[in-house]
Regions:
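Bacterial Sec-dependent N-terminal signal peptides
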Residues: 1-27
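Asp-box/WD-like beta-propeller blade repeats and closely related beta-sheet repeat scaffolds
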Residues: 27, 108-139, 144-145
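A short beta-strand motif characteristic of beta-propeller blades
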Residues: 27-34, 78-85, 118-124, 159-165, ...
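Beta-rich, blade/repeat-based domains predominating
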Residues: 37-49, 66-67, 85-100, 126-142, ...
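Beta-propeller domains
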Residues: 54-76
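Short glycine/acidic-enriched loop and turn motifs that connect beta-strands
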Residues: 58-62, 108, 149-150, 187-189, ...
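Short loop/turn segments that connect beta-strands within beta-propeller blades
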Residues: 73-77, 113-118, 155-159, 191-196, ...
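Blade-level signature of beta-propeller repeat domains, shared across WD40, Kelch, NHL, RCC1
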Residues: 251-280
Length: 280
């Protein structure tokens, strides 16, 4: 066998191996709640207790009206308490550190006792207009996005500072290790501890929520009704498109052990669960 034939055979075998390893993904619907969850925007899980915390806007997403709150449901969709926390305005993103639950509430971050649902305190974010998503890193540092001012704020020991500015369309955040993964408009990016940005992928719509799969890949939602699987190197696979049905897909949660997505439907007034199925 000459050198050319050997090289060609090697390339052919490599392609066959790669093709065999290539994976595709799909979603299988598991359940949905009744349409009684009042404009759910974000889901935060406590898998040890089998609980999902759900932010409820309950009305105008920009109104300072005191109607918003946090609900509790089980991981199989049963309602525990629609009024676990009350007295918020238009809460969106949720985060947790220890026994404290954090809720992005327009111009403030509400700190909630996760055992009682009572609001312990509120952290004012100066100049904030539309606080949206929240994530908390392993050290307890809180990051919160402001979609109107294009800023990402950092809260450490109750003190607020600005981490990033001019992030157009900023919404979803997720702290993973020393990196902060960010959805800004159609861009999926990550920032290092100094705020240096690296673009990972360009979506077809404005990103809302994001959750790591556990292998470097991410699940990403667009509010209008799209769920994507995005690989670590930026390849995008569409898992769900409910835009024509006018079923929103807001800030999701993901169980990377059972491979289940929990998706709030905003104006749909319910939470839906899907199984992520991986095939080769």
């Amino acid at each position: 066998m000459n050198k050319f034939s050997k090289h060609f055979l090697s390339v052919l075998m490599s392609f066959a191996i790669y093709s065999g390893l290539a994976q595709t993904h799909k979603l299988e619907k598991l359940w949905e709640t009744d349409t009684i969850v009042r404009v759910p925007e974000s889901v935060l899980p406590d898998f040890k207790k089998g609980i999902l915390y759900v932010s409820e806007i309950d009305g105008n997403p920009n109104a300072v009206d005191g109607k918003g709150g946090v609900a509790k449901i089980t991981v199989d969709g049963k309602i525990i308490d629609l009024d676990f926390t009350t007295g918020l305005n238009a809460p969106k993103g949720l985060g947790r550190f220890g026994n404290e639950l954090y809720a992005a509430d327009l111009s403030e971050v509400a700190v909630i006792d996760i055992n009682t649902g009572k609001i312990k305190s509120k952290i004012a974010v100066d100049s904030a207009k539309a606080l949206n998503d929240i994530t908390v890193d392993a050290k307890g540092i809180v990051y919160v996005s402001d979609s109107k001012t294009k800023k990402i704020h950092r809260i450490e020991n109750g003190k607020v500072s600005t981490f990033l500015t001019n992030v157009a369309g900023v919404n979803g955040l997720k702290a993973v290790g020393d990196e902060l993964f960010i959805l800004g408009g159609q861009k999926f990016m990550k920032a290092d501890s100094r705020g240096n940005l690296t673009q990972i992928a360009m979506l077809s719509c404005g990103g809302d929520g994001l959750e790591p799969v556990g292998n470097g890949d991410f699940l990403i939602t667009c509010w209008a009704g799209h769920i994507f699987y995005v690989t670590a190197d930026g390849k995008i696979e569409t898992l769900l498109d409910t835009q024509e049905k006018k079923v929103n897909t807001a800030d999701l949660a993901y169980d990377n052990i059972k491979h289940i997505l929990y998706v709030p439907t905003f104006w749909g007034n319910k939470v839906m669960a899907y199984k992520l199925i991986t095939t080769k």
